[in-house]
Amino acid sequence: MTDATTTDVLVLGSGIAGCGAALAAAREGASVLVATKAQQPADASTDWAQGGIATTRDDPESLKRDILAAGDGEADPEAVDALVGDAAAAVEDVLVDTLGVPFDGEEGFDYAREAAHSAARILHVDAATGHHILGPFLRHLDAHENVDMLEDAAALDLITDEGAVTGALLDRNPRTGDRAETGVPVFAGSTVLATGGIGDLYRRSTNPRGSTGDGVAMAALAGADVTDAEYVQFHPTAYDDADPFLVSEAVRGEGALLRNADGERFMPDYHEDAELAPRDVVARAVAAERDATGEVRLDVSPLAFAEEFPGLAEACADRGVDWETGIPVAPCEHFLCGGVAVDTVGRTSLDRLFAVGECARTGVHGANRLASTSLLEGLVWGLRAGETAAGDDRAPAPSEPPELRDRDPDLPDGFAAEKFRRLRRVMDEHVGLRRTGADLQRAQGVLRRLKGEVDSYARTRTSRDLYQLRNAAVVGLLIARAAGENPESAGCHHRSDEAAAEEAPDAGH
């Protein structure tokens, strides 16, 4: 076992939520260690965020109404109040004053409007807002005397002691030439999960590869509460390809139209807000029209696309897409609205453990996330959790970490790839945009068997790939089980058998 490291606050993840937690804790004088499994800390979901970050401007109540409406009755008003109450100050203090993010606008900020927003309130930088936030954030933290950063350091498991989380075990692949190490214990006064999303559970996702739900899985296995796992959001307009890229909501906000293979605009038939309807509505409509006619394209002719969205125009050119004839789009996995249950400062049900960002269920999003609120939620909850974690002033409490097998990076050829193919196939086919009770039961059976195979193999060796497979299987099971236990459609959880279940004589029994 490698010598242990101690720190006041351990942050697992280097996106906007993890950076926010690290900044707030460091400002309180705490020692902070940020560990990310990415080879570069900037390889986080935040860096892929396009559209922007919503703020309240001078009307927090209208943002609250829009969030609650998008959440389809499942959002927590107290959590939404916390978000809109902190929004303006957090954006101004951190993003504008501290980091100097170059938001678009020559004289003042250029606020954009996106789907399901009643007003223009979204700050953006081209269609690469996350990239322009995360780079300055990481550089600022790297220069902070209270913050240390570890890249290519994956958390394998949380360390617990009598119901409290006392740190985590890391798998390290240092770039310095030092030997790789597995089972490196880091003991912390408080641990903050900021591990991002679950995109690797699906064949097509807007998330970076490696988004295997690690924080949700580790927390669940340690005994933390996980809620609303069924609410997996599918973005309606990703490039229709095996390797998709996101076509930001902001493009529709500027006037782009959705047309089927017959050239017909169809969204007015599905919702009064047409292309600016909530994401779940647009995603199901796009899927239906694509199934019926063979293709859906985003018509960008109503706007000066290359001038307003040069990054997206370049992405189209790189793929050989002639955007002047429309961009082929289809829904793909985008965001987990549920996750590790937390309160308004990011506390989980386990002592000393916090969760922020996409791995957390704050209650803000309910059954469906409003466009451009993920960066804001990550920032606000990161700041709240970091300040609270540092304020707890708990000394690291070294305890006995779980024993790991010898490190074995050499899995049988194709082992991890084959298991992930099976997992993604069952998630796509049975736990996707449209669901039935029978499909969800089938998925649970396959995922249980897959997890059993991975667990059996892991009894004799340790590998980062094995732990990521385990995490993906655990989270897949949590999603399928929650979806199966919720027969009512809401937001991005759509039960296509709901009407039949309501008509059946034994419904509800």
UniProtKB/Swiss-Prot annotation:
Keywords: Cytoplasm, FAD, Flavoprotein, Nucleotide-binding, Oxidoreductase, Pyridine nucleotide biosynthesis. Its EC number is 1.4.3.16. The lineage of its organism: Archaea, Methanobacteriati, Methanobacteriota, Stenosarchaea group, Halobacteria. Belongs to the FAD-dependent oxidoreductase 2 family. NadB subfamily. The gene is nadB. It catalyses: L-aspartate + O2 = iminosuccinate + H2O2. It comes from Halobacterium salinarum (strain ATCC 700922 / JCM 11081 / NRC-1). Residues 389-412, 486-509 are annotated as: Disordered. Its cofactor is FAD. Residues 499-509 have a biased composition (Acidic residues). The active site is at residue 279. GO terms for biological process: NAD biosynthetic process. It is found in: Cytoplasm. One of its GO terms (molecular function) is L-aspartate oxidase activity. This is L-aspartate oxidase. Pathway: Cofactor biosynthesis; NAD(+) biosynthesis; iminoaspartate from L-aspartate (oxidase route): step 1/1.
